[in-house]
Amino acid sequence: MFAKTYHATHPDMMFAVSNDDLRDRYLMQGLFQDGQIVLTYNHAERFVVGGVVATSPIKLPDQTEPASAAGHPFLERRELGVINVGDTTGKITVDGVAYEIVPRDGLYVTMGAKDVTFEGVDGAARFYLVSLPAHAAFETKKLAFADAIPLERGALETSNERTIYQYIVPTTCKSAQLLLGMTVLKPGSVWNTMPPHLHDRRSEAYFYFGLGENDRVFHYMGEPDEMRHIVIANEEAVMSPPWSIHMGSGTANYTFIWAMGGENLDYTDMNVLDICQLK
């Protein structure tokens, strides 16, 4: 069912880790394959991160393990966030109710939904997926890009002018633990999440897209005084454990989707660091 499983890690495991091992532990590649749903399982907060390329209707699979859950709906005890990251309109049908999802629109699907199907409307549709365990059911809700809460941050002079769009936060869409949004860097800006921060009570996944074929993002992670980096290409994701900073710089401006899960739903629950603390 899952293309790869990522285990939770301790900061001590960063000591002397090779570049290949670092990528193997945190980088999620190959999420978008024609006609497939690709899902990865992360033990950090039990995150599921994945991608869909709907060349024809594709159903979210049922659970396959453990044996006691085999055949049960994927969202029996989970909630799901979806954003259309392609250039064509798609459609998501949840228990018989269809939602048209244009590029940059999203959908929150509540725990307990039984049948979720993805398809294209005017060509193959590309959807990015994140799912977390849920303890309560809420309302399945379309998340229009036009309705997302924009937060303007940074400045062109510091190469980090960006707009943060909040899709799933308590003021716009109720969820059990999932927070979801998208950050768009302005032309001439390349730094995200600057200055960086920590949130010890939450894990976070970053999904980078909108990059050219020859562009890359250098994603920085690790403890503030023991930083490492992972070079990331278009449509790749990275998991940030609670003890790790997370920020990036690109060879050009780009867009990334952030998804968080953990103990609370307070977007501002973070420990902002001074850039001089980094090593």
From Swiss-Prot:
Keywords attached to this entry: Isomerase, Metal-binding, Zinc
Residues annotated as binding Zn(2+): H197, H199, E204, H246
EC number(s) stated in the UniProt entry for this protein: 5.3.1.17
A single BP term in Gene Ontology: pectin catabolic process
A GO molecular-function annotation: 4-deoxy-L-threo-5-hexosulose-uronate ketol-isomerase activity
Catalytic activity annotation: 5-dehydro-4-deoxy-D-glucuronate = 3-deoxy-D-glycero-2,5-hexodiulosonate
CDD domains reported in the protein's UniProt record: cupin_KduI_C, cupin_KduI_N
Top enzyme class: isomerase
Keyword Phosphoprotein: no
Cofactor(s) needed: Zn(2+)
Cofactor mode of binding and number, as noted: Binds 1 zinc ion per subunit.
Source superkingdom: Bacteria
UniProt keyword Iron present: no
Pathway(s) this gene product operates in, as recorded in its UniProt entry: Glycan metabolism; pectin degradation; 2-dehydro-3-deoxy-D-gluconate from pectin: step 4/5
NCBIfam families, per the entry: PRK00924.1
HAMAP family assigned to the protein according to its UniProt record, in alphabetical order: KduI
Family: Belongs to the KduI family.
Function: Catalyzes the isomerization of 5-dehydro-4-deoxy-D-glucuronate to 3-deoxy-D-glycero-2,5-hexodiulosonate.
Protein name: 4-deoxy-L-threo-5-hexosulose-uronate ketol-isomerase
Gene name of the encoded protein: kduI
